[in-house]
């Protein structure tokens, strides 16, 4: 990456309006409590529209019926999406049954969506049910604080069931990081849980009174598994173990995938290696990284406010040295690590604890009762008898964790009865991913989750035609360039531009360590299928042993690799 060391550490200029909103919010309170009493609208108004994001919610509406309601002179059917804070994705069966009941009784869609940030979210919570939603979470020991907006979001942790002892240590650090970096304001408890206003003044010693310049994402990674897609995150801790126990972390900073169509000052970026730290320095280093980004991040232009742009502007070494100064910790040389897997291992695995772990493939993470496949009910039935816990994965799947040998047959029987196990699911489908997009996401430009099943059906047929059905290609679809579907770490990435129009990116790799380059701009799904039919056919015939699709495209000069995205991401690819 570039190392420009002469740039100003703080960007001068008029602050974005989001900065005004945060400063005037009285530590994230705004007038949310008053808005809750306003029955004239189903939404939150003014600054509250954005402030509720700090409380884990986005205001949405059903875009399928937006035009119809406008014709009837009705406001959009506002409803909230609420996202739980669930570091490491671990949740108990008792907690699961509570959220299952709430989804059935108090949401418009009756579904639970497992996200690729290892948590779950509800879609379609009407305003009158918002406060009960937060109270339900609190009653089970959960909350939605800081799962959106300019804070450290839900902390990811590798969900590797085979390394159960190491996973437990890494998971504990994911929880510690989440708690350490949480907002300290009492606003959440006052507004949603009816806690009395504390007389003392709120302080935010880490995040500051205007919080971070932009969203901030953190992961804890256990090699050789990159299931959390570390390069999508601002701050990453790669576990280094000795004799089966954590001794420290390699620290990587500045990953991120979001961009803006037509704005070449925005681009996806891989995280940069800072160095190795011993385990007891983790929180000090994490805090120093966050506060450096807090102070140096661009608060004048939100499109360039993320950590990745701060590193590009001030230089990697300058940022790293500031982290060392603030933390009092000097980075050591990076310890050796490698990645060999990214997708989840669907099916049963036995852990070192001699318990069993069943990873269930959940397409796009959507748990809903479908005809002939009541998936949501099935998970609830498992929760009623399961003695271990559940783990939500960063690939939007669900692990039934810690199953005793004596219960294994019972758990599998329930899963099969409710359609949660399907032996016909192909490797390509297991590795595919899509964001939510239409009808609920206000930023969606093209279909993603609703588009993915038919798209993967077609690709499966192409794979079968060329005799490569046992192989997989990492295919991801995101409905807009914000990148929630992590298409910028796929071998085949589709980025929505308009209804049935996508930018096609090719040339990422299976491990998620290379950004794909745009191959064609603004083309239809049919055009994409025709292109992939040809290229998959070539790959099937001419690939080398164990050569992935993305690697093949680069070796054969179909696409040029992105080497330094800050410089070469927008280089024009010649049509071949």
UniProtKB/Swiss-Prot annotation:
Task: Give the SUPFAM superfamilies listed for this entry.
Answer: Nitrite and sulphite reductase 4Fe-4S domain-like, Nitrite/Sulfite reductase N-terminal domain-like
Which one Pfam family would you cite for this protein?
NIR_SIR_ferr
Q: Where do transmembrane segments lie in this chain?
A: none
Cofactor(s) needed, names only, are: siroheme; [4Fe-4S] cluster
Catalytic activity field: hydrogen sulfide + 3 NADP(+) + 3 H2O = sulfite + 3 NADPH + 4 H(+)
Gene Ontology terms describing biological process = cysteine biosynthetic process; hydrogen sulfide biosynthetic process; sulfate assimilation
For molecular function, the Gene Ontology terms on record are:
4 iron, 4 sulfur cluster binding; heme binding; metal ion binding; NADP binding; sulfite reductase (ferredoxin) activity; sulfite reductase (NADPH) activity
The signal peptide, as residue positions, is none
Checking PROSITE patterns in the record gives: NIR_SIR
Keyword set includes Transferase: no
Entry EC number(s): 1.8.1.2
Give the Gene3D superfamilies listed for this entry.
Answer: Sulfite Reductase Hemoprotein, domain 1
Keyword tags: 4Fe-4S, Amino-acid biosynthesis, Cysteine biosynthesis, Heme, Iron, Iron-sulfur, Metal-binding, NADP, Oxidoreductase
Note the InterPro entries from the entry.
CysI (IPR011786), NiRdtase/SiRdtase_haem-b_fer (IPR005117), Nit/Sulf_reduc_fer-like_dom_sf (IPR036136), NO2/SO3_Rdtase_4Fe4S_dom (IPR006067), NO2/SO3_Rdtase_4Fe4S_prot (IPR045169), NO2/SO3_Rdtase_4Fe4S_sf (IPR045854), NO2/SO3_Rdtase_FeS/sirohaem_BS (IPR006066)
Q: Which residues bind siroheme?
A: 484
Give the highest taxon in the source lineage: Bacteria
Q: Is this entry keyworded Metal-binding?
A: yes
Could you give one GO CC term from the UniProt record?
Answer: sulfite reductase complex (NADPH)
Pathway note: Sulfur metabolism; hydrogen sulfide biosynthesis; hydrogen sulfide from sulfite (NADPH route): step 1/1
The note on the cofactor says:
Binds 1 siroheme per subunit.
The subunit structure is: Alpha(8)-beta(8). The alpha component is a flavoprotein, the beta component is a hemoprotein.
Q: What is the role of this chain?
A: Component of the sulfite reductase complex that catalyzes the 6-electron reduction of sulfite to sulfide. This is one of several activities required for the biosynthesis of L-cysteine from sulfate.
Q: What is this protein called?
A: Sulfite reductase [NADPH] hemoprotein beta-component
Taxonomy, top ranks, is: Bacteria, Pseudomonadati, Pseudomonadota, Gammaproteobacteria, Enterobacterales
This protein's gene is called cysI
